[in-house]
UniProtKB/Swiss-Prot annotation:
Function: Catalyzes the phosphorylation of the position 2 hydroxy group of 4-diphosphocytidyl-2C-methyl-D-erythritol.
UniProt cross-references to Pfam families, sorted A to Z: GHMP_kinases_C, GHMP_kinases_N
Naturally occurring in which organism (per UniProt): Tropheryma whipplei (strain TW08/27)
Key words, A-Z: ATP-binding, Isoprene biosynthesis, Kinase, Nucleotide-binding, Transferase
The protein, known as: 4-diphosphocytidyl-2-C-methyl-D-erythritol kinase
Keyword Ribosomal protein found: no
Phylogenetic lineage: Bacteria, Bacillati, Actinomycetota, Actinomycetes, Micrococcales
GO function terms (MF aspect): 4-(cytidine 5'-diphospho)-2-C-methyl-D-erythritol kinase activity; ATP binding
Record InterPro entries: GHMP_kinase_C_dom, GHMP_kinase_C_sf, GHMP_kinase_N_dom, IspE, Ribosomal_Su5_D2-typ_SF, Ribsml_uS5_D2-typ_fold_subgr
Keyword Kinase: yes
Ranges annotated as biased composition (Polar residues): 1-22
Active site per database record: 243
An annotated GO BP: isopentenyl diphosphate biosynthetic process, methylerythritol 4-phosphate pathway
Enzyme class: transferase
């Protein structure tokens, strides 16, 4: 493991690189862009030099990957809908490949697409909720056979949030799949460079690092053609952190145990306002404070969430009924600990809930970011404007609707 100026991690591998794939052809250069945020990942293949101008039109994909392993569901639309759309593919792991009309239907919450599908001119309006969704880190992932180090991770904005490479979840995710390839006794490991553009604030309770890890798992799985399904990746993601499995899929979900057991819910579009703090809050310190508080006498868990099975059912029903019902259930056990470490959070929550149309304000993750649930898009934008006038840094976002068919891909 080597570092370059604190902004780039480079990891070598125990086996030599091979510049040819198992079919005896030069290793193709593929460039991927992985968009990661706290609720979704969209993988879009930008270019693939496979003898065809448009990979969407490529109908001659082989039934084995570059490691010689069989591809169970070969599909001409693997990875992308269109190279010009900058919109993520459905079925990027090739377990649920669909045509564009079906992709539109999925991303519009099962409403279907009213226009004729066209590979060369996809209906970008069908993806409005997706393309405009929230904040995301962007991880361009380049694969070639010319780099000295098989795995390189660099931070595009010149700031590496961690000092130790093994504390970097993105690097740990890359090495996790690298180790799997080693165990499969293959001698082919393509050089991979990942440049992370951090747009999600660090130490803000928004799972930005975990989102990066999940995006790396998805991107490398596709780029290296290791052919793990998302269910396979979900199981592996648990080794990286409790919230990484959820981020493999995104959407709305209930996690239990250590986070590896995830139950997904169908949702309608929800509107939120994210309020940021100028100061970070250490997740480790928040949990330490929570442990201290819970070690005291008379400490009880929130009654609504004391029974996992009941909790999942209550959330499912509330989400179906709408934002008002969901707001009544919103709670974060870390709130008291975060308030103890950053007392101004309490006043920020009160100020946020005074905004018309804001149904509930809670801290996101371990804080200090606040997540404000709004009754509709107008209320979210109005609250954002009001809070900005008081000096609060905030952003109105929406979470797309999800139908059950999304998680079948």
């Amino acid at each position: 493991m080597k570092t370059d100026g604190g902004n780039t991690w480079r990891a070598s591998h125990s086996k030599p690189l091979n510049t040819a794939n198992t079919m005896g052809e030069p290793f193709s250069h593929s460039e991927y862009s992985v968009h990661a945020d706290q609720s979704e990942f969209y993988l879009n293949e930008l270019t693939e030099h496979s003898g065809q101008d448009n990979p969407c039109m490529n109908t001659s994909r082989l039934n084995t990957n570059r490691y010689g392993h069989p591809v169970v569901h070969p599909c001409p639309k693997i990875h992308c809908i269109c190279t010009q759309s900058n919109i993520a593919a459905i079925g990027s792991d090739c377990t649920g490949c669909v045509d564009i009309a079906q992709a539109c239907k999925m991303l519009r919450g099962g409403q279907g697409c009213t226009q004729d599908p066209c590979v060369k001119n996809p209906h970008t309006q069908c993806f409005t909720d997706v393309s405009n969704h929230a904040m995301r880190n962007v991880l361009p992932l380049n694969v070639s056979n010319t780099e000295q180090f098989p795995i390189q991770i660099e931070y595009a904005n010149g700031r590496n949030p961690v000092l130790n490479p093994m504390d970097d979840l993105a690097m740990r995710a890359a090495l996790l799949l690298s180790k799997d390839i080693d165990l499969q006794n293959t001698h082919i490991l393509p050089s991979t460079r990942i440049s992370i553009e951090k747009n999600i604030p660090v130490a803000a309770g928004l799972a930005g690092g975990s989102a990066d890890a999940a995006a790396v798992l998805l991107g490398i799985n596709s780029a290296w053609q290791t052919n793990y399904s998302r269910c396979d990746l979900l199981g592996k993601a648990g080794a990286l952190g409790a919230d990484v499995p959820f981020l493999i899929w995104g959407g709305a979900a209930y996690g239990s145990g250590t986070g590896s057991c995830v139950t997904f819910f169908e949702t309608q579009t929800l509107y939120w306002v994210l309020c940021f703090s100028k100061h970070p809050l250490s997740t480790r310190k928040v949990f330490q404070e929570l442990d201290r508080q819970r070690s005291g006498a008379g400490c009880n868990h929130h009654p609504v969430f004391s029974n996992p099975a009941e909790c999942a059912e209550m959330l499912k029903k509330a989400i179906k009924r709408g934002p008002e019902a969901l707001a009544a259930l919103l709670h974060n056990d870390l709130t008291s600990a975060a308030k103890m470490l950053m007392p101004e959070i309490a006043e920020r929550i009160k100020a946020a809930e005074r905004c018309p149309g804001i149904l509930r304000a809670i801290i996101s993750g371990s804080g200090p970011t606040l997540a404000l649930l709004a009754e509709d898009a107008e209320a979210a934008n109005r609250a954002c404007s009001i809070l900005k006038d008081t000096g609060v840094i905030c952003k109105a976002v929406s979470s797309p609707a999800y139908s059950s068919i999304y998680w079948q891909t």
